[in-house]
Amino acid sequence: TVGPSMGKENISRGVQSTIWGFIAIIIMMALYYMVFGVISVITLSVNLLFLVALLSALQATLTLPGLAAIALTLGMAIDSSVLINERIRDEIRNGNTPQASISIGYKMAWGTILDSNITTMIAGLALFMFGSGPIKGFAVVLVLGILTSMFSAIFVSRAIVNYVYGNKRQISKLSIGE
């Protein structure tokens, strides 16, 4: 639902800016990371779907701070994909096989993803505990978004990568850009 404090124009601008940001992410990721970029965008879409479904299940009211938290969540979620993709690229450059590069890339990126998300979650929890009104709403959406982002980055993207580049397939090259 939409809170009474949000005017029609604010809703429209917030949604439009999020959509344009999402389109920019799609283009950049697909061009820069090729197949892995498309996988990242699919993962981001699933993350957004999880977050919206969770907010809907909780019957949360959409406010401007909540919309800002969703936009921030999208940025953090795609950052996790970039970390994973870059780790995989590093492992390919180190001479590992494509399958080994994927496996090592996910393992090596996990610590960084966890650290960055936990520190942001601590800030979100502090905002929730000590904030009021719109600040609490922002904090709730942020924390839920962090949880869905971490789940999506590790489990959803890995499942898609495994589907595309399954362990039993003989792969000589990954489509992840240079």
Model-derived regions, located:
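Hydrophobic residues within alpha-helical transmembrane segments
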Residues: 19, 23, 42-45, 67, ...
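Structural signature of multi-pass, alpha-helical inner-membrane proteins
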Residues: 1-18, 168-172, 178
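Residue-level signature of catalytic and energy-coupling elements of molecular machines
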Residues: 6, 25, 54, 82, ...
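Membrane-embedded alpha-helices of multi-pass transport/permease systems
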Residues: 78-81, 85-88, 158
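Hydrophobic alpha-helical transmembrane segments of membrane transport and translocation systems
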Residues: 90-178
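Small-residue-enriched core segments of transmembrane alpha-helices in multipass membrane transport
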Residues: 38-59, 70-77, 138-153
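Interfacial segments of transmembrane alpha-helices in multi-pass membrane proteins
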Residues: 8-63, 129-133
